[in-house]
Amino acid sequence: MSLIVTRFAPSPTGYLHIGGLRTAIFNYLFARANQGKFFLRIEDTDLSRNSIEAANAIIEAFKWVGLEHDGEILYQSKRFGIYKEYIQKLLDEDKAYYCYMSKDELDALREEQKARKETPRYDNRYRDFKGTPPKGIEPVVRIKVPQNEIIGFNDGVKGEVKVNTNELDDFIIARSDGTPTYNFVVTIDDALMGITDVIRGDDHLSNTPKQIVLYKALNFKIPNFFHVPMILNEEGQKLSKRHGATNVMDYQEMGYLKEALVNFLARLGWSCHDKEVFSMQELLKWFDPKDLNSSPSCFSWHKLNWLNAHYLKNQSAQRLLELLKPFNFSDLSHLNPTQLDRLLDALKERSQTLKELALKIDEVLIAPVEYEEKVFKKLNQALVMPLLEKFKLELNKANFNDESVLENAMHKIIEEEKIKAGSFMQPLRLALLGKGGGIGLKEALFILGKTESVKRIEEFLKN
């Protein structure tokens, strides 16, 4: 089997979005699964729209999710000399030609064609032109598209695709200022980089016949193509910013783990063994672009949150602390290692994102300044206050290094007072955490420690 070589080739005119990252992941997995090469190419030939910040953001996103590319990043803006050579080669071989048609002439032609209910297109008037070039017009360069031929290719996702070259006009490969066009530079670079397999969005499907024309004109080997359907929202519409079409790095800020995001995106449009959770090793073992779906996939926040919660629960306390560093939350330095582990173990089971986990740390460690009103109103204060006073005395005697001792202290109150567990547990939870829900009470007592637990009960009794 020949070496698999893939690439991801974004334009730095905006930040890397979720659909682009999915395409990059598919290319990465296919190359790595076959011990091949995966390249990153920045398509920055549109000098007026390029953004250095956007290019850097693409690189930053790659680093975050762990997509390591081979070799140096290839920037198309540094390769204009190469493109110029190949344009001249096509001109010299009479496979391309200068077109002197002005914009006004082209616009007029299109209007005439529309009036005749024809598809607007260039009419090849300069294809075999041998006369004196008109003055004052900087020509474009057009490729001579073979006439009355069928261009066919077997797309790995779409199946057999056929286009009659009569549907194509002699498209431009170099603008009047000499800069090459998109389809031309993509073809040149894919060929010179030895790309064997092109996995990209199906919005590029219409470009493929034009690129095949160029491959053939230059006697380049044509790669395999896989055109992946777009990602839709759950209503079947194009992704909007609200529905997930946002900068990839925003997902890091929202508290998603890279493992969860890669797993989620790899499953958008690809399936294997009815599994949902895939480690990187499993993705590399099972991924094959031939298994990509031909219909669009739907972005589901519910599924992403479920996956992220799964990965969050399986993180060690040490890694969680590293992952939590970008988020603001209470100081943890007063907790001993056992308390810290207990805090993170308790909260990661109740959190879907790192951001949510950071908020829940505050909910435990910051003493309540007010109490959940609907829970507070239901309390029988005449019963509750003596119970908490009695429990406070038990806590002062208790060994806070043993959670079972704390649990026994709570059950002792319930048994001695012959009351239902909720009659005591609910007000105790309100005193410690300020609300009716949250982590278990024995965990809360253990994490807060004796001094803080007693202090919070005393503050509650004052209210």
Curated annotation (Swiss-Prot):
Gene3D superfamilies: 1.10.10.350, HUPs. It catalyses: tRNA(Glu) + L-glutamate + ATP = L-glutamyl-tRNA(Glu) + AMP + diphosphate. GO terms for molecular function: ATP binding; glutamate-tRNA ligase activity; tRNA binding; zinc ion binding. This is Glutamate--tRNA ligase 1. The gene is gltX1. Its main location: cytoplasm. It is found in: Cytoplasm. It comes from Helicobacter pylori (strain Shi470). Signal peptide: none annotated. A motif ('HIGH' region) lies at residues 10-20.
